[in-house]
Amino acid sequence: MKKIFILFTVLILSGCASLFEGPDCRYTEANLKKVSKSELAAVIGFADGSSEITSENKEILHQVAKKALNEKAKVVVYGHASHRTRTQNILQRIFINLKISNERAVKTAATLISYGVEATDINTLALFDSRPIRVEVDGAAEAANRRAEIYLYWLE
């Protein structure tokens, strides 16, 4: 299931509407069939409305970067947001959460790059509040959903 999720993520990031359109997508398809393994390397949390990387999370990302470099892994960073915003307008909520989840993914990737991971080895995807890991019935659940997930994957 993780390989399929990574496959579709890379397709989305490469701008491919399907596996069979255009030469760039054929190249992507050929490479994606060579993904041999993927794993969740880390999940880092964020304060409400923030995309700042804490010192604790910097250390976690430093360890992820070391592993990616030592094992020649590629990286996908998924940015997430909690559902709650200060607006009831659904389009504004989506826009706000898309923006913050993108900032979280990009800043996480930038931190990995600062630790030596090549920018060309990292993809980011903003998932706004579309994939909560907890139902938001309290502040702890909201906090759990404000996160970035960092996956490593290896090509054969």
Question: How should these model regions be labeled?
Answer:
Residues 13, 77, 124:
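Short glycine/serine/threonine-biased micro-segments
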Residues 46-85, 109, 113, 150:
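Periplasmic peptidoglycan-binding/anchoring modules of Gram-negative envelope and division proteins
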Residues 13, 72, 119-121:
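A generic structural signal for alpha->beta connector loops
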Residues 1-39, 50-52, 57-62, 149, ...:
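N-terminal targeting leaders that direct proteins to extracytoplasmic destinations
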Residues 37-48, 89:
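Acidic/histidine-rich, surface-exposed loop or edge segments in extracytoplasmic proteins
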Residues 83-156:
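Periplasmic OmpA-like peptidoglycan-binding domain that tethers envelope proteins to the cell wall
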Residues 36-38, 68-70, 141-144:
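Extracellular/periplasmic catalytic domains that process cell-envelope and extracellular macromolecules
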